[in-house]
Swiss-Prot record:
Belongs to the SEC8 family. It is found in: Midbody, Midbody ring; Cell projection; Cytoplasm, Cytoskeleton, Microtubule organizing center, Centrosome. One of its GO terms (cellular component) is cell leading edge. The modification N6-acetyllysine is found at residue 9. The exocyst complex is composed of EXOC1, EXOC2, EXOC3, EXOC4, EXOC5, EXOC6, EXOC7 and EXOC8. Interacts with BIRC6/bruce. Interacts with MYRIP. Interacts with SH3BP1; required for the localization of both SH3BP1 and the exocyst to the leading edge of migrating cells. Interacts with SLC6A9. The gene is Exoc4. The modification Phosphothreonine is found at residue 238. Residues 32-114 form a coiled coil. The modification Phosphoserine is found at residues 32, 226, 469. Transmembrane segments: none annotated. This is Exocyst complex component 4. InterPro entries: Sec8/EXOC4 (IPR039682), Sec8_exocyst_N (IPR007191), Sec8_M (IPR048630). Component of the exocyst complex involved in the docking of exocytic vesicles with fusion sites on the plasma membrane.
Amino acid sequence: MAAEAAGGKYRSTVSKSKDPSGLLISVIRTLSTSDDVEDRENEKGRLEEAYEKCDRDLDELIVQHYTELTTAIRTYQSITERITNSRNKIKQVKENLLSCKMLLHCKRDELRKLWIEGIEHKHVLNLLDEIENIKQVPQKLEQCMASKHYLSATDMLVSAVESLEGPLLQVEGLSDLRLELHSKKMNLHLVLIEELHRHLYIKSTSRVVQRNKEKGKMSSHGKDASPGPLIDVSNISTPRKFLDATQYSAAGSSSVREMNLQDIKEDLDCDPEENSTLFMGILIQGLARLKKIPETVKAIKERLEQELKQIVKRSTTQVADSAYQRGESLTVDNQPRLLLELLELLFDKFNAVASAHSIVLGYLQDSVGTQPTQQEEIKLYDMADVWVKIQDVLQMLLTEYLDMKNTRTASEPSAQLSYASTGREFAAFFAKKKPQRPKNSLFKFESSSHAISMSAYLREQRRELYSRSGELQGGPDDNLIEGGGTKFVCKPGARNITVIFHPLLRFIQEIEHALGLGPAKQCLLREFLTIYIKNIFLNQVLTEINKEIEGVTKTSDPLKILANADTMKVLGVQRPLLQSTIIVEKTVQDLMNLMHDLSAYSDQFLNMVCVKLQEYKDTCSTAYRGIVQSEEKLVISASWAKDDDISRLLKSLPNWTNMAQPKQLRPKREEEEDFIRAAFGKESEVLIGNLGDKLIPPQDILRDVSDLKALANMHESLEWLAGRTKSAFSSLSASQMLSPAQESHVNMDLPPVSEQIMQTLSELAKSFQDMADRCLLVLHLEVRVHCFHYLIPLAKEGNYAIVANVESMDYDPLVVKLNKDISAMEEAMSASLQQHKFQYIFEGLGHLISCILINGAQYFRRISESGIKKMCRNIFVLQQNLTNITMSREADLDFARQYYEMLYNTADELLNLVVDQGVKYTELEYIHALTLLHRSQTGVGDQTTQNTRLQRLKEIICEQAAIKQATKDKKITTV
């Protein structure tokens, strides 16, 4: 067991360590480092036991595998014998070869002679075959050219010319053929260059044309449901992807350009033009073999701009043809949408052309790379040259369509800002445009046999003409708009930029991406667009809106020009608006639309909005001052409206807040009439206290009703303008706060509006509302100032100590004038103001008149019974007039009438009346009544008696107040 353990130990050690010498060194080190003799003896014993065990295992293995071991030994012996035999045979072969060499050396001269003769005969046969083949070259060349297998034709022609000018140069019979083939070789590259240009500019765009035709068919199928443009602009925010070779190559050929030029092979069994990318590679390969690459590059450079112009011309005709087939007339309808359709088509085509050029340029670089000796001599163009020419052509196109040369007559109005002076056209400008419904014809001849055959014939003729020249003949050409020798799909004008700006900007971004321009550098087309908008378009827009606004604001009296009924109906307003306000609002709306159409210049348009609104605000302020200012002094109503305390008080009263809130939405108040009556009393108290007992001269009131009507129109107009501008600005600010996901669906690249501009716009809208409120306050106060103007002199200067006669039966002339003024103002206000504002002006007027008349009692020198009757008749006629205006009984004037009827009593009777009926008036009003009675009646005692009565009046009023308070406290306790 110990031996097996020792053997297992050493076997495991050997299996772990593949190096036996290392194991031996380890054992020796163990024996040498051990100081104990017994340990060394034990180690030695283990080694011996392991050795004996290994020897026994080896014997067992030999016994077990004896057959295999014997077979291996025999196989080894057989292999050794074969190797020995092979060595002997090789030695014999070497000896035989040496013998053959010696024999051949003896016959070398005869063999050399036979070999040379064989070569000569073979060469003669080759020349004869070559001559025979060359004679067939013209016929084969013609066949290859007809089938457009240009690479085979080029190889055949180059090879034939090289043979004719080389080995066969001395053959006289081939001189005519030599001249013919040489001439064809000199002209073949022109054919190849022409084919290359056809594929660069026509074939490359054919797929774009086909795609638009398919889209047109889809649009025509859905035309009955909702007619729309041929080019779908609903997804206009999606950037256009660059076209690659797969868009005009055959299916499955997307990796064609990944092949080198040398790897391109021509398949004689296929249509060579089926794969345009491969075909252009074949053309370049043929030109390279003709050594005409420099001429090819030169031709491409020289013809690039002209070919791009031809694409524009063909695309214009194509768009016109699409419109013609849809039944649209370009000469009747000015449709910038067709310009957008044209540009979208051109962008697709130019991208296709650029992709084709990139492929051709790659092939040219491959062809130059195979000729290192000429690499420095041949200077290729690059894609930057292509994009520069594309930008130049687009720039020329935009110059024409944007009318940068100002070919339109100066008298021709702008499409967007031409506000018609006639009412019907002016109203039509604001009317909602109804979608045009296609007119359904009653019957057609298109399904008749004659129509079908004629349509097929015409369609085939048009397709053939278009495939050859790329232009449509007849029909749509007559549909194009002529202009200075150029044909347009829509009328040239600066406003066309609004339709095409965003698509054009996206294409510019694609160009800059293709050119690898960083943010700091712009392409030429962007610079052109920026210069045009900043230096031309913005100034033109400003000139147009200035002309339109000045046309209605620079008149002698801009506040008298109102919009007509048609415009009011379209705008949905109930009262007339100033035409100047509508023009300004439409200008703001137009500028806001321009801000969205040309979002990159939103700040400029918003600044214009601020400037125009500020100018109109100044215009309105000037017109307002022209009405309310007389000899450098404001009329009283305007000065009161300007007073912060008075205006703040008036706006805090419930009748002002009720005016801004519909009646059904107002909060219900208990004893609302008493609440409003208290408000009227407060207003009357402030106005009477503010004026005092001064007489108002005629120049301090607005006597001309047309001025009041102008103020009313200004109020309605400015309030409408403030509401429209607030709505526009709030939608603008809301669009700036959208989430990015929402913003992508609402707006494209609309930069955030600065807080300063938004604040300015908000302040302007608020200033218009404030000005409108001030106009309404002036009207509200002016009616009341008229009452002061007529009623204060009635008491101060009127004679009411009259006897009963005919004169006493007449109304006071001042009351008649006041009634006349109130009626005139009512007529003007009812036509100019909305009903709730009209009510605001005249509600509470009876209370004020009542207060003025009651307060005027102190100014009468004396009053008789006839004077009291006349005064009551004055009050009655005023009450009757106000009732007709407000359509409610003016109970406050009953209060004034009862006050004067109270003067029928003597002073003592008046005191008893107060005791019996309670206190209806203020202590001061009772004092004025007692004082007037004391002045008017005889035998009422001296001043001492009068003072006693006044003292008694105070006591009565105090007693009545105490009784009233006690009753009130009792009610509270009961509750």
